[in-house]
Amino acid sequence: MRGLRPALSTFLFLLLITGGVYPLLTTALGQWWFPWQANGSLIREGDTVRGSALIGQNFTGNGYFHGRPSATAEMPYNPQASGGSNLAVSNPELDKQIAARVAALRAANPDASTNVPVELVTASASGLDNNITPQAAAWQIPRVAKARNLSVEQLTQLIAKYSQQPLVKYIGQPVVNIVELNLALDRLDE
């Protein structure tokens, strides 16, 4: 019985620290130092939430830049079903999916002169990626320019404006947030 009291005291102390103090402290510090990120990096226009800067959306029209394909089942870009397709590189089903995506992109982008960028036909590990390279966005310019009656130069400048450089120059590559880019396109129409 004597050994039970110190064990129970230690258990209750650690329960209080790890189950109460630590979560409350990290939540408070996150809200204080990084309020936008701690609340989901939501993109707002007025009182309306238009999306999150962290999760891709299913932009399908010709007047929008398209992101990476979603690997989530049933509903594209469903954050509650995050996860990759888990298809191995040697799986014939993956080859079929990529071939179908390439054919669809070629049909939607007949004026594109180079090969389809790889990130437009392969899903990310989370299945929710919202970023593509500026080169993949530029590949789609002829289709978007035609659908929105905008010049190639206007769209090139917009891509440059919404391109984000890596924190460390030699680690990573520049990316374009598709959600922010497409919302900027919608604002041009207003």
From Swiss-Prot:
| Record field: transmembrane | 10-30
**Covalent S-S links between cysteines:** none
Where is this chain primarily localised?
A: membrane
Against InterPro entries, the record matches this protein to:
KdpC
A Gene Ontology molecular function term for this protein is: ATP binding
Taxonomic superkingdom: Bacteria
Q: How does it sit in the membrane?
A: Single-pass membrane protein
Q: Name one GO cellular component term.
A: plasma membrane
List UniProt keywords, sorted A-Z. ATP-binding, Cell inner membrane, Cell membrane, Ion transport, Membrane, Nucleotide-binding, Potassium, Potassium transport, Transmembrane, Transmembrane helix, Transport
PANTHER family according to UniProt: POTASSIUM-TRANSPORTING ATPASE C CHAIN, POTASSIUM-TRANSPORTING ATPASE KDPC SUBUNIT
Q: Which NCBIfam families match?
A: kdpC, PRK00315.1
**Functional summary from the UniProt entry:** Part of the high-affinity ATP-driven potassium transport (or Kdp) system, which catalyzes the hydrolysis of ATP coupled with the electrogenic transport of potassium into the cytoplasm. This subunit acts as a catalytic chaperone that increases the ATP-binding affinity of the ATP-hydrolyzing subunit KdpB by the formation of a transient KdpB/KdpC/ATP ternary complex.
State the family it belongs to.
Belongs to the KdpC family.
Protein name in the entry: Potassium-transporting ATPase KdpC subunit
Show the taxonomic lineage: Bacteria, Pseudomonadati, Pseudomonadota, Gammaproteobacteria, Enterobacterales
